[in-house]
Amino acid sequence: MKYHDLRDFLTLLEQQGELKRITLPVDPHLEITEIADRTLRAGGPALLFENPKGYAMPVLCNLFGTPKRVAMGMGQDDVSALREVGKLLAFLKEPEPPKGFRDLFDKLPQFKQVLNMPTKRLRGAPCQQKIASGDDVDLTRLPVMTCWPDDAAPLITWGLTVTRGPHKERQNLGIYRQQLIGKNKLIMRWLSHRGGALDFQEWLAARPGERFPVSVALGADPATILGAVTPVPDTLSEYAFAGLLRGTKTEVVKCLSNDLEAPASAEIILEGYIEPGEMAPEGPYGDHTGYYNEVDNFPVFTVTHITQREDAIYHSTYTGRPPDEPAVLGVALNEVFVPILQKQFPEIVDFYLPPEGCSYRLAVVTMKKQYAGHAKRVMMGVWSFLRQFMYTKFVIVCDDDVNARDWNDVIWAITTRMDPARDTVLVENTPIDYLDFASPVSGLGSKMGLDATNKWPGETQREWGRPIVKDPEVTARIDAIWDELAIFK
């Protein structure tokens, strides 16, 4: 699935019936969300609203509204192929030297992909075809959506924020929502553990009082966007990973007002800075939890330049109670996580983040248990191995005879293989999502692990039950006469 930029990708989607153009005027205030939500719940196409009311710029929604389109954005034909992306990431996270000539030959495709990792810097780029600076900067000209009735203000949702710490060569790319508060002002809502916030804190320590340069790309190519939400190893830049996905080097261009590099083919680039100490109350906003979050203070992003392509497209989304676009992304990225976890914990058979659990708050793991206490080791590993699971509140561990993606199976294991006192692990005072208002303290709460595996000697003193298994010979005999019985005819 080869493409160069967002527009190229939209052409591919349209050819496959995965894009619908909406010519009827629709309001970015609430109406686009209503249409996008109904479409996503029905498994429908990406939507390009060509005539948003009050604006000259079209709005793109539901780009990643199905797992298939997420896979297409990662250069794959179907979701199952995302396991290969996970295997590549696992290899890059902990590369192993070839064990011999045959192993070297087997690894050649991976080494060949690595050649696409370096970025290609352009002198001029499509994203700088039109330039606004100074008093000409006006964010209110963008068709920024208001998604829910009680949202505080229009909200940029798919902004790809580019930052760099003072002592780093590698840039960080992150998706952080941004509240519109003026013609050239946005609130940058990044949590303290995220890459952009860490870069900012390092900047404040190294250069106190100096403005922190920031750029935000809107409408980047899907590989670059997905690179920012995928568990990329800390030693690998999101741009490099995007090159691996796309099969070509990521093209970047130096921003006009700072030394950051932005995606050259992005539709819109916002350039500016964060003034140390300039904060503003952000929210409330309806979020992926299905609730409005509480108001809190975050840094203000001052925009000094807006550069864009001719006939630019504004890329947006909404977040709400699952299913929403982040939940769909979670379903697809789940396949990427499995090989990464399996490389560290080979005993893991499957790993599942149910979308109804807000994509990351509950995980189900199935494993080949090998000794007493093994399930507890795995649950601790899930919480600690990847930072993406730092906020996972519940981890359920089952044996490999259980289907992690079938609640009937999982609930059967919980109710037949668990003693609540013995098999429940509670860990207090751990990092918790700021949006989780159920936690007693903002950003700090507890976690629960459920060991729903068969118990081994040392874990129980009782004779353990044997699962009922049908006689295969009887099953075969009944299969042979089933149609003749005509029970359902």
From Swiss-Prot:
Residues forming coiled coils: none
Record has Phosphoprotein as a keyword: no
Cofactor detail note: Binds 1 prenylated FMN per subunit.
Domain of life according to the entry: Bacteria
Subunit relationships: Homohexamer.
UniProt catalytic activity: a 4-hydroxy-3-(all-trans-polyprenyl)benzoate + H(+) = a 2-(all-trans-polyprenyl)phenol + CO2
Sequence positions that bind prenylated FMN: I175, Y176, R177, R189, W190, L191, R194, G195
Keywords, alphabetical: Cell membrane, Decarboxylase, Flavoprotein, FMN, Lyase, Manganese, Membrane, Metal-binding, Ubiquinone biosynthesis
Family per similarity comment: Belongs to the UbiD family.
One GO molecular-function entry: metal ion binding
First-level EC class: lyase
Source species: Salmonella paratyphi B (strain ATCC BAA-1250 / SPB7)
Pfam families the record matches: UbiD, UbiD_C, UbiD_N
Gene Ontology BP annotations: ubiquinone biosynthetic process
Cross-referenced InterPro entries: UbiD, UbiD-like_C, UbiD-like_N, UbiD_bacteria, UbiD_Rift_dom
Protein name: 3-octaprenyl-4-hydroxybenzoate carboxy-lyase
Annotated Gene Ontology cellular component terms: cytosol; plasma membrane
UniProt cofactor(s): prenylated FMN; Mn(2+)
Cellular localization per UniProt: Cell membrane
Associated pathway: Cofactor biosynthesis; ubiquinone biosynthesis
Active site: D287
The enzyme's E.C. designation: 4.1.1.98
